[in-house]
């Protein structure tokens, strides 16, 4: 069986926000091309305005939705909630707020969800969160797995809940099959859609999609794409996530990595090529990790303009 063509492509308009389709599961149900963007909140209050400026430029690209990550150390923090509210209420783009649980208890999660409700945020990406490097770390007690957070979110309101998945397996997982079993439990807990960790070889994703569907995981899976624009960035990414780098991508980094402008252009081109191949093979939902760089996202969106045009 050809794992690359696991579903039939429908090249169509990219979905736009119309005020009534705030929930991501409804956006994805249209089965049209969806390109969404991710941003991270400021670490300090003094950087809030500069992040808002970048977010506004990204929103001008009319993504299907925009996700806002949690800060270092987990949790949501007021910065994440404020940026998510700005995206949705000021920029009229559906917001997806990340939420981690490893360092939180039920009371904290309930309070956070209430804050998000007040801002009209309906989409949550439920994450366990990274384990701190300190080997003596002990979880807060109420949550050990993302599946437990998914259940708790649903108890607190009518949220659309997303989850993370790992085409190459989670770094803590002993085998991809074990990882898929855990993923199935998370989906069964009430996940409406999944977003993948970054990958640089599309064949890895196609194999993962085939295995996931075999396991009965039928929710939409959004492909996460990271445009790599400098050589130091890719070294850090691979060290943290164990992401595989195909030889053709290594050649790009080796050839252009010392020139920031050239590497940025090559990184945009590589990400664009990945996305075009994904859409051509039936993966209609793509999520771009922008690193708060509007010019990078704009370069990719310009390259895709005819594919996602109205």
Which residues does each PLM region occupy?
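N-terminal amphipathic alpha-helix/helix-capping segment at the start of soluble metabolic enzymes
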Residues: 19-37, 44, 309-310
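Active-site-adjacent beta->alpha loops and helix N-cap segments on the catalytic face
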Residues: 24, 47-48, 74-86, 105-111, ...
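Conserved beta-strand positions in the central sheet of alpha/beta enzyme cores
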Residues: 36, 67, 125-126, 195, ...
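Active-site mouth loops of central-metabolism enzymes
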Residues: 36-50, 96-107, 162-178, 256-269
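Conserved, mostly hydrophobic/aromatic
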Residues: 38, 66, 116, 186, ...
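Active-site beta-loop-alpha junctions enriched in small/polar residues
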Residues: 39-42, 69-73, 98-104, 129-130, ...
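Short, acidic/polar
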Residues: 45-58, 80, 106-113, 175-185, ...
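Active-site pocket-lining/capping segments in soluble small-molecule metabolic enzymes
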Residues: 140-166, 216-268, 273, 304-310
């Amino acid at each position: 069986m050809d794992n690359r063509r696991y579903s039939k492509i429908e090249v169509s308009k990219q979905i736009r926000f119309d005020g009534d389709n705030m929930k991501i599961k409804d956006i994805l149900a249209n089965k049209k091309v969806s390109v969404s963007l991710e941003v991270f909140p400021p670490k300090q209050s003094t950087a809030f305005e500069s992040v808002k400026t970048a977010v506004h430029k990204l929103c001008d690209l009319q993504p299907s939705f925009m996700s806002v990550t949690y800060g270092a150390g987990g949790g949501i923090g007021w910065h994440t909630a404020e940026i998510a509210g700005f995206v949705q209420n000021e920029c009229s783009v559906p917001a997806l707020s990340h939420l981690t649980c490893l360092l939180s208890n039920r009371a904290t999660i309930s309070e956070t969800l209430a804050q998000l409700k007040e801002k009209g945020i309906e989409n949550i990406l439920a994450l366990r969160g990274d384990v701190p490097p300190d080997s003596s770390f002990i979880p807060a007690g109420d949550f050990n797995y993302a599946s437990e957070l998914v259940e708790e979110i649903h108890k607190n309101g009518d949220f659309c809940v997303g989850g993370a998945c790992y085409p190459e397996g989670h770094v803590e997982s002993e085998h991809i099959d074990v990882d898929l079993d855990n993923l199935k439990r998370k989906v069964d807990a009430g996940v409406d859609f999944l977003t993948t960790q970054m990958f640089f070889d599309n064949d890895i994703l196609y194999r993962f999609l085939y295995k996931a569907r075999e396991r009965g995981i039928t929710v939409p899976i959004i492909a996460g794409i990271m445009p790599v624009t400098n050589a130091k960035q890719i070294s850090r990414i691979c060290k943290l996530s164990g992401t595989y780098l195909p030889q053709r991508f290594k050649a790009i980094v080796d050839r252009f990595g010392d020139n920031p402008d050239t590497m940025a252009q090559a990184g945009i081109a590589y990400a664009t090529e990945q996305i075009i191949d994904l859409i051509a093979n039936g993966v209609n939902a793509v999520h771009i990790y922008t690193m708060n760089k509007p010019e990078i996202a704009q370069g990719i969106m310009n390259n895709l303009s005819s594919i996602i045009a109205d």
